Amino acid sequence: MINSVGVVRKEAENCNCLQVFFVSGSFKVDSVEAKKKEENFRETLRDMANSKYEYVKSFELEDEVMLPNLMVVRIDGRDFSRFSQVHEFEKPNDETALNLMNSCSAAVLEEFPDIIFAYGYSDEYSFVFKKTSRFYQRRASKILSLVASFFAAVYVTKWKEFFPQRKLLYAPSFSSKVVSCASAEVLQAYLAWRQQDCHANNQYDTCFWMLVKSGKSVSETQEILKDTQKQQKNELLFQKFGINYKTLPELFRQGSCLFKKKVEETVKHDENGNPVKRLRRKAVFVHSENIAGRSFWNEQPSLYNDLGHFTKDIGKIEPDFIRSFQFENKLLPLTWVVVRIDGCHFHRFSDVHEFEKPNDEQALKLMNSCAVAVLEEFEDIHFAYGVSDEYSFVLKKESELYKRQSSKIISAVASFFTSTYVLQWGEFFPHKELKYPPSFDGRAVCYPTYNILLDYLAWRQVDCHINNQYNTCFWMLVKSGKNKTQSQDYLKGTQTREKNELLSRQFGIEYNSLPVIFRMGSSVFRLKEAENGVVSGKKLEGEVVVDHCNIIERCFWEEHLHILSYS
C-alpha cells in the first residue's frame, strides 16, 4: 500500500505506467486536505496518461480508395470446403445453399444503398459501389470488414429459414478484399473474369463429382480430369453420364447477379379498393450468360448511370488486369499486428435491444465469449482486450497468418466474431429476440516494438476508464430525471474528481466499487503451459481465459511473459 501522495508521485516518475488511479485502494488518506491532493493527483495522472498514450494513433495508416476508382468488395467463404462437408451440402451444387448466399447478398444491397450491383456463385460474392460513393470515407479496411461482417451475420440469421431441419454446427466466416477498378473498362474485365471462373469451376466440379459418384476415387478423378479442356469435359459429361452441360440450371453455370432497378409496386389501396402503384428502386436477381457484355449492361439504366457504359465486348482478359485484381497489401514483417473491431451503430443496436445503461453485463459477457472463440479459432492471436462494443486482437510478432495479407486477416476476424455473436446470442439473452443482424468494422495496425504495443493497450484501457466514468454519470443523471441534453450540459468540462464527487454525493456510488469488468474492461489470453506437463489448479494449460486486470502497469506483463512470448 502506498502511504502518501509524495511516494506515489515518486513511483509514477520512475515507472512506465502513470495510471495508478486504476488500482482500487492504492492510496491511504488521513485528512481531507490529503484526500484533495490525492484526487488532484489522480486527475493529473489521467491527463498525463491519456496524452502519453495517444501517440499510438499515429501508426494507423490511411487506406482510402481514391476517386475516380470504382470500388468492388469481394467476399469468399473461409474454408467453405470443410463447412459444406460438415453441413452435408449436395455436390457439386447445393441449390438451397446458393439461395441462402443470394438472400444474404440481397440483404447487403438493402443495408448499403451505395452498392449498385452484385455478382456471386458458390461461396463468393462481389459487390460494386456506385462510382461517386463516399461510403466510410472510402476507407478500404473499414468497408471490406463491414461487408464481410454483415454478410456473415445475415448468413447465420437466415440459416434456419433455408435449412429448417439442419443445425448450424459452427460459425461460418468470410474473407474479403477491396478491388479498385480505374474505369468501367476495368470493372468489365473484373466481372468477366469472375464469371469465367464460375463457369470453369462449375464445369470441373460437375465432372469431378459425377466421376466420384460413379465409383472413382478422388485421386483417380483428379488424374482423369488433369489438363482436360472445356470441350473434353463437355464430352465426358455427355458420353459417360448423358448430361448436356448447357441444360444445367443457369444458377450453377452462370452465377447470380443482383442490381437495383425501378419496378412497379403496390404501395396502398384507395377508398374503392383499387391498388395505388408507384415506381420503386428494388433489387432484382438476373441470370445472364455474359454479365460483362454490352447487350446486358447497357440495357440497364441503373447500371450505366451509376457505374458507366461498357463501350465494347470483352474478349481475352488482360493478364495485367488479373494481376491487379489479385494484388494483396501485406503487413510489415516482424511487427506486432493489432486487429481492432468496433460495433457499427451500436448505440442504436443497444437501444433497440434494450441493453441496460450505462453497462449491460450480459452484453459484455457475450462480447467476451466471442473474443474467446476468436482466440480458439486463430492460434496466432495471443491476446485480446475489449470494452463496450470494441475488441483489440494482438497477433504474435512472427505471425504469418494469411501470409500477413491485411484484408484477409481483418475480414476473417471481424466476420468470425460477428457470426459467433449471432450464434451465441440466445445463450446470453434467452428471452430476448435478436431483432436485426449486428455488424463490426475493423482495421489492422502494425506496432514496431513491444513497448509501443503495450502503450497501445494502455491507451485502450485509459479510454475504457474515461468513457465508463462519463457514461456512469450520464445515465445516473438521466435516470434521476434529467433529459439527455441537460445531462450532457451538466457534465461538460467536468474532471475526474468532479465526476467521482457527483456519483458519491448525489447517488451514493463509489466509482472504485463498481464491477471491475466495467472499469477495466476484459483481457483474454491463454494460460501458461506447464513446463513439466503438470498444471496446478483446475484450469487446463493453454486454456483461453477472461480476466479483468490492470494491463497498464508493466507488472501484469512481467508476470505473464508467456502471453506475448517476450522476455
UniProtKB/Swiss-Prot annotation:
Localisation: Nucleus, Nucleoplasm
Enzyme class: transferase
Binding locations of Mg(2+) 2: D342, D389
GO biological process terms on file: DNA damage response; G2/M transition of mitotic cell cycle; positive regulation of cell cycle; tRNA modification
Keywords: GTP-binding, Isopeptide bond, Magnesium, Metal-binding, Nucleotide-binding, Nucleotidyltransferase, Nucleus, Transferase, tRNA processing, Ubl conjugation
Residue numbers binding Mg(2+) 1: D342, G343, D389
Highest taxon above the source species: Eukaryota
Record-listed GTP binding positions: D342, G343, C344, H345, F346, H347, S388, D389
Cofactor stoichiometry and binding remark: Binds 2 magnesium ions per subunit.
Cofactor(s) the protein requires to work: Mg(2+)
UniProt signal peptide: none
Claim: Transferase is one of the keywords in the record: yes
Catalysed reaction equations from the record: a 5'-end ribonucleotide-tRNA(His) + GTP + ATP + H2O = a 5'-end phospho-guanosine-ribonucleotide-tRNA(His) + AMP + 2 diphosphate + H(+)
Predominant localisation class: nucleus
EC number annotated for this UniProt entry: 2.7.7.79
Cross-link (Glycyl lysine isopeptide (Lys-Gly) (interchain with G-Cter in ubiquitin)): K397, K403
InterPro entries with a match to the protein in the record: Thg1_C_dom (IPR025845), tRNAHis_GuaTrfase_cat (IPR024956), tRNAHis_GuaTrfase_Thg1 (IPR007537), tRNAHis_GuaTrfase_Thg1_sf (IPR038469)
GO cellular component, one term: nucleoplasm
Function according to Swiss-Prot or TrEMBL: Adds a GMP to the 5'-end of tRNA(His) after transcription and RNase P cleavage.
Family label: Belongs to the tRNA(His) guanylyltransferase family.
PANTHER family: TRNA(HIS) GUANYLYLTRANSFERASE-RELATED (PTHR12729:SF6)
Protein name: tRNA(His) guanylyltransferase 1
Gene behind the chain: THG1
